[in-house]
């Protein structure tokens, strides 16, 4: 009359929100780097190439930092080269602090406010 006990350890991923918040935090702190060359010492060939901060006053990135080589294109203006259409002429929400808000969407150029009355038919019964 023996018994068998099975123990199972489960590893769970964090919630999508937790992962998103973590990545957003890293993205906001990302730094531009250049591909550095330490020299041609054969003994240190493994460390021959490394990432250096573009600005020498900044500290080198750690293995968990997000880095980038090229600046993002200016999405505020039209560019046939990068395929960005710009934001001029788009509708925005003047009271929203989100992505559809005028402050962000208009890229600091200012905006014109327009009042519009919309009449729609509804099948309302009273």
Swiss-Prot record:
Gene3D superfamilies: 3.30.2460.20. SMART domains: WNT1 (SM00097). Palmitoleoylation is required for efficient binding to frizzled receptors. Palmitoleoylation is necessary for proper trafficking to cell surface. Depalmitoleoylated by NOTUM, leading to inhibit Wnt signaling pathway. Signal peptide: none annotated. InterPro entries: Wnt (IPR005817), Wnt1 (IPR009139), Wnt_C (IPR043158). The keyword Secreted applies. Its main location: secreted. Pfam families: wnt. GO terms for molecular function: cytokine activity; frizzled binding. Keywords: Developmental protein, Disulfide bond, Extracellular matrix, Glycoprotein, Lipoprotein, Secreted, Wnt signaling pathway. GO terms for biological process: canonical Wnt signaling pathway; cell fate commitment; neuron differentiation. It comes from the Eukaryota. GO terms for cellular component: extracellular space. A lipid is attached at residue 1 (O-palmitoleoyl serine). Glycans are attached at residues 93, 123. It is found in: Secreted, Extracellular space, Extracellular matrix; Secreted. Disulfide bonds join 92-107. Belongs to the Wnt family. PANTHER family: PROTO-ONCOGENE WNT-1 (PTHR12027:SF91), WNT RELATED (PTHR12027). Ligand for members of the frizzled family of seven transmembrane receptors. Acts in the canonical Wnt signaling pathway by promoting beta-catenin-dependent transcriptional activation. Plays an essential role in the development of the embryonic brain and central nervous system (CNS). Has a role in osteoblast function, bone development and bone homeostasis. This is Protein Wnt-1. The lineage of its organism: Eukaryota, Metazoa, Chordata, Craniata, Vertebrata. The gene is WNT-1.
